Amino acid sequence: MQAEREISNGTLWAGRIIGGLPALFLLVDGAAKLVKPKPVVEATVGLGYPESVIIPIGVVLIICTILYLIPKTSVLGAILLTGYLGGAVATHVRTGESLFSIVFPVIFGVLLWLGLYLRDTRLRALFG
C-alpha cells in the first residue's frame, strides 16, 4: 500500500466546500421531508410516491449525508448517496421530467465525489 500523501490546506478546503455545499442541500432536503410542508408532499406524491414514504426517505437521506460528512465513514456515505441520487435520476426519467431534473442529481453526485477525492487521502491513493 502506498504511503499516504499529505493534502495541502487549499486542496482540503476546496474539497470541504465542493462536497459540503451539496451535502448541506441534502441535509436541508432531508429535514424538509421530516417536516413535510405542503410543497414537499405535493412534489413527492406527484413523482408517484405515497405520502407515507416521505419521512423514511428523509431519514435515509439524513443518515447517508451524515455518514458522508464524518471523515471515517465518508466513503460509505458517498456510496450510499450515489445510490440515493441514482434513485432520484430513475424517478425523474420514469416520470418524464425535464433534462435538468435528470442531470441535477448526477451533478450533485459528481460534486460529492470530487469533494471527497480532494479531501480524502484514501480515495486519492486508490486512484493514484
Predicted ranges, named:
Residues 34-46, 61-72:
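Short juxtamembrane and helix-loop transition motifs at transmembrane-helix boundaries
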Residues 36, 40-42, 49, 93-100:
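Membrane interfacial helix motifs at helix-loop boundaries and amphipathic/re-entrant anchors
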Residues 24, 28, 49-69, 83:
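Core segments of alpha-helical transmembrane spans in multipass integral membrane proteins
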Residues 1-28, 70-128:
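Extended, low-polarity transmembrane helix blocks
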Residues 29-33:
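A short secondary-structure junction motif
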Residues 34, 47-48, 87-90:
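Generic helix-packing signal
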